[in-house]
């Protein structure tokens, strides 16, 4: 299971000019997800989208299951197509009558090289 960690978040706080002027304060906060990814309820994606972990993991599990199903179905389809092709070729050879009376018939049946 992959846990994407949040980056450090910078908060800037400004004070109004009529009060005591001071430079803006930068506060760096390390999110709890960085230390405890297991108890986190949200996952930050690579594009910065914060999504609920249960929903994201459910979608990932569904996609993983469907991908495995598609791979199995594709493999079965390839085997089925190969079986049909070999049956068709064998059937064609058995049903086609061999008439070797003329040279043109020999060329049709693929006997002349």
From Swiss-Prot:
Q: Which organism is it from?
A: Bos taurus papillomavirus 4
Name of protein: Probable protein L3
Q: Which UniProt keywords apply?
A: Late protein
């Amino acid at each position: 299971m992959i846990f994407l960690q949040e980056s450090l978040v910078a908060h800037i706080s400004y004070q109004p000019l009529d009060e005591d002027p001071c430079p803006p304060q930068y506060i760096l906060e390390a999110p709890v997800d960085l230390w405890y990814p297991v108890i986190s309820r949200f996952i930050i994606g690579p594009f910065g989208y914060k999504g609920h972990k249960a929903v994201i993991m459910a979608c990932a599990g569904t996609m993983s299951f469907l991908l495995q199903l598609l791979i199995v179905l594709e493999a079965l389809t390839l085997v089925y197509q190969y079986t049909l092709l070999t049956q068709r070729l064998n059937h064609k050879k058995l049903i086609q009558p061999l008439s070797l009376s003329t040279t043109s018939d020999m060329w049709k049946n693929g006997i002349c090289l």
